[in-house]
A protein has these predicted regions:
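Alpha-helical transmembrane segments and their membrane-interface boundaries
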Residues: 1-137, 141-297, 304-354
């Protein structure tokens, strides 16, 4: 494996190489490559988001984050269908992420929930056909981030331009990297494979209904940063209940641990470098291959931003409450939904047998 090829590995792949190292020299080499990868990734991410902030305004730095997520994911990931159709779908996804979160913010929580359901239905049914590629961690997360950091007026006009540029970049990179791949399925196959009795479709419907419902309830309760609850729910919803229960536990424990670590750093470090706690969290995520540790370090960046608006006590309280609410609601909702679907299937089988 070349140096460049090793740089392309994810955290799990890099750590697997470290475990398999037979000599100290080999282990040190793989560790060096791993650290270079993290440093290069952090530097590139910082530079990329900074460029978007300069071009489209600080309030639109989140656009840089969303575009960066899409570029890094879809340069390798696909939608499982013909490349040309996938490219057009990606362009449509960017239109949805640009327009629908903004419109939903102008509506009441209930009407906003209905619009969010319609928007997520397109993103998930056509962009997240394979749950184990975790495209929802890009598309739905991007949607929720843009929803949570909404802007108006001139700033929204700049957001339109930034998202248009992001769509062009993502579609170009995606098509270039996938144009020579052969896919037997097309858009029509995705529609035909919609089956309410399959674990995939039930998972998709849970994402489509549950995440907007969580946002709506949080907003009706006047809870700031409702997107945190939505992101927590999205992250926890998986096709199998055993996996989902594991994620709920890790999300709750990880967030509480992350909050404690953040508070310790907040009081130990001088106020002039508080903003760098978020960068430290990003490095931690880069070093983490397991979901629980990622939940710990993701807390750093969220709290570093929220503390400026709500103070330490308010930000910490919101983070814990929103995350616990999001994952617990998702677990209860999906448990009931999966149970109802299984009962419906049993009824259909019984009627057919008679």
């Amino acid at each position: 494996m070349t140096f460049y090829q090793e740089l392309q590995l994810n955290q799990a792949g890099s750590k697997n190489l470290l475990k398999k190292s037979e000599t100290l020299k080999e282990k040190l080499y793989h560790m060096w490559v791993y650290l270079v990868k993290i440093a290069a990734t952090m530097a590139f991410c910082f530079f990329f988001v900074s460029i978007f902030s300069i071009l489209f305004g600080k309030e639109n730095s989140i656009v840089g984050v969303v575009v960066l997520l899409c570029l890094m994911v879809f340069r390798n990931a696909d939608l499982g269908i013909h490349t040309g159709q996938s490219t057009m779908l990606l362009a449509l996804f960017f239109v949805i992420m640009t327009v629908c979160p903004h419109l939903a913010n102008q509506l009441s929580p209930v009407l906003g929930m209905l619009l969010n359901i319609a928007a997520l239905a397109v993103l998930i049914l056509f962009g997240c056909h394979n749950p184990f590629m975790f495209n929802q961690s890009t598309l739905v997360l991007g949607y929720l981030l843009l929803y949570g950091y909404d802007v108006t007026g001139k700033s929204y006009q700049m957001r339109l331009t930034g998202m248009a540029l992001g769509a062009a970049l993502t579609c170009f990179v995606f098509y270039r990297n996938h144009k020579n791949r052969t896919y037997k399925r097309n858009l029509n196959d995705l529609v035909q494979e919609f089956d309410i009795s399959s674990s995939r479709t039930k998972w998709q419907l849970c994402q489509i209904i549950c995440v907007p419902a969580v946002l709506c309830i949080a907003e009706l309760c006047n809870m700031p940063r409702a997107m945190w609850a939505g992101i927590a729910a999205m992250s926890a919803i998986l096709p199998f209940m055993e996996d989902m229960q594991y994620r709920v536990r890790k999300r709750i424990v990880g967030n509480i641990a992350g909050v404690i670590c953040f508070i310790v750093l907040y009081f130990l470090l001088p106020s002039s470098i508080y903003t760098y706690i978020g960068i430290l969290g990003g490095i931690g995520v880069g070093l983490s291959a397991k979901y629980g540790w990622q939940a710990v370090f993701n807390t750093f960046g969220a709290l570093a931003i929220a503390t400026e608006s709500y103070g330490l006590k308010g930000a910490v309280g919101l983070r814990v409450i929103q995350n616990v609410f999001g994952v617990v609601f998702a677990l209860i909702f999906c448990s009931m939904f999966y149970w109802l679907m299984s009962k419906k299937k049993e009824t259909v089988v019984t009627v057919a047998a008679k």
